[in-house]
Amino acid sequence: MSSMLSIRLNYLSARTGLLALFISASPLAAQTTLGQLPPAALNPAPVAAPAAPSSPQVSVTDPAAAPLAQWSVLRRGNGFGFASYANFLIAHQDWPNEAQMRAAAERAIRPGVDSPTLIIRFFNLYPPQSPAGWLRLAEAQLAVGQSNSAFDAARSAWTGGLLSSDDEARLMSRFSSQLTGQDHDARMDKLLWLRATSAATRQLNFTTPARRPGFEVRLALLTKAADAPDRLAYATNPIRLDPGFIADYMWWLRATGQGGVARQILRFNMPMAAYPASPEIWLQMLLLSAQDAAKDGQWQMAYDIASRIGTAYVPGTAVRERPFAERDAYTDLTWLAATAALNRLNAPAQAAAMFTLYANAAKSPQTQARGWYWAGRAHLSAGNAAAAEQAFENAARFSDQFHGQLASERLGRLPDVTHDAIDVPITPQERSKFLNRSVVRAMLALGRAGNWNEQSLFVRSIANAVSTDAEHILAAELATQAGRPDLNVLVGRNARNSGLSGYMKTAFPVIEVPPEHMPSWSIIHAIARQESQFDRAAVSRVGARGLMQLMPATARGTAPRAGLTYSESRLNEPAYNIALGATYFSRLMTAYGGSYVLAVAAYNAGPGNVNRWLRTLGDPRQDRDVLDWIEAIPFSETRNYVQRVLENAVVYDALNPAKANVRSNTPLSTYLGKRYPG
């Protein structure tokens, strides 16, 4: 083994099952070593995954050492056998990189080679994520005599979408007798919604005579065939009533420079024989045309198109429970319709209805509060005070959120951030079960080894797995034990988003602030919580470092003003990072005349961008409503950042009144520089 890699692998007795692993290799060296593993290490076997570079200092006597070594290699590569992935994932649920390893496991299955029993066991715990995965499950079930289950899985594979041509042939050779004409039509429809035209061309001959003409027209549209206009001319009502045809026709119109025609068609309710099989594609179709209309200043048309969201779902569908991509397009449409009605069309009642749909579709407290707050504002504009009060009450339930805090002010009260304290008894058995989870043991082992970066991955996994109030409390205790306030933030957010209680104290941990910066105590916490979640070793994709995420160049320029010597290696030291971050923020506050909104925006986007926005958007300190100014910030990241930091500051002030930056009956409005509540 090359001495250049500086790697020493030291295996203890196989009987004990312990793996001694000492590593001092760079990531590049570690990757090189993975590539040098012998072929035998890549073959499936009923044993743990091959040993590989793990956390540098985890003790070989620590029970977490061996699984950490396995996790380290499996998460870095795709070249290992299915059994390696499956055995690890079955034994170590909720570990980091689970989704990545699940996908690799599905790709690694070798039909006729890998154990059918292991394949079935794996998919029972981790359901297939792709049509190919369903096919592998079907083949495994057929191999062990589970014929009915195999036929169902094969049908899911066939109707689920895209398969390779080889897998298409494998499925048809084994299961074609179990597939009906309806199954073939369903697959064709799915492929067309996916815009998978090559696979759809292969599928066309399997479709039923009744549906084939419509599929031929849709395929011609999606491929922009020369005869597409002729086929359109002969498309009869059964075809034109198909939502798949409508979506493909709109796509073709936009693709051939006829977007205006598409808008005119979409602005009116279209008769359809069914609801679209792909709400996501349907909503995206509406969104593109509505946005095009808005860009051209056609606000009534933009509203008309965006308000057709009801065509995407069967009545009564809980949009909040639909996949993110669907919810995202749906809320974009309702927001566009609502703001067009309120700000452009002088139709506040219609705006209130759209804001209400937006709030009801939203999953996160942040988005729900935003929708309810603006629904309240729209109801007020429409003269409906009772409906406005109820909307503000709905928003005020989210007292740690920007718009929930504004709603509380509208109702004449302070945001209630202390109401959810709970005391859930934890039994010794519950505590022992939690602490003995392999993901918790691994997280603690990495902490003992001083491996902060990899421990951070486990911190996130533990936070995401919290599902009960008891687990919430235990995870919060673990955060304190491990010295990981970022785990507290993540656990608290997950508890909030999952509807659990008592998250406020957990989600807003406290850190030590240098005495000279105590006057900025709340805003320091507010920025650090948003920037790094209090992860002192955080490094952003652009190189910002530490609690307050300082770019090295900014830190270098700020150090003399803070009375400090610049040292890049110290940016991960909390006190040093806070001193520089607080000094830089103080300079921004001075530069912008004490405006928290502008200083916070500049901390995120830079003073140059903020100065440009002051020229193009107006000045929220003078001639522009501050809420409208924030909504008009062209960078979505900065728009979100300003709201999150200021809502954090309000919570920290309320939870720690002796250290509050702002003491007011309208705290958020005070931070915003507004003269009116809410």
Language-model features, listed with the residues they occupy:
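TPR/TPR-like (Sel1-like) alpha-helical repeat modules
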Residues: 93-94, 127, 142-143, 147-163, ...
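Bacterial N-terminal signal peptides
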Residues: 15-27
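N-terminal leader/linker segments that initiate helical-solenoid repeat arrays
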Residues: 31-79, 417-438, 448
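Alpha-helical repeat scaffolds
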Residues: 56, 81-89, 115-125, 149-158, ...
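Alpha-helical adaptor scaffolds
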Residues: 74, 90, 98, 102-110, ...
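Residue at a conserved register position within TPR or TPR-like alpha-solenoid repeats
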Residues: 109, 141, 191, 220, ...
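Catalytic glycan-binding domains that act on GlcNAc-containing polysaccharides
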Residues: 85-91, 261, 273-282, 296-309, ...
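Generic helix N-cap/helix-start motif at coil->alpha-helix transitions
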Residues: 39-43, 60-68, 78-82, 93-103, ...
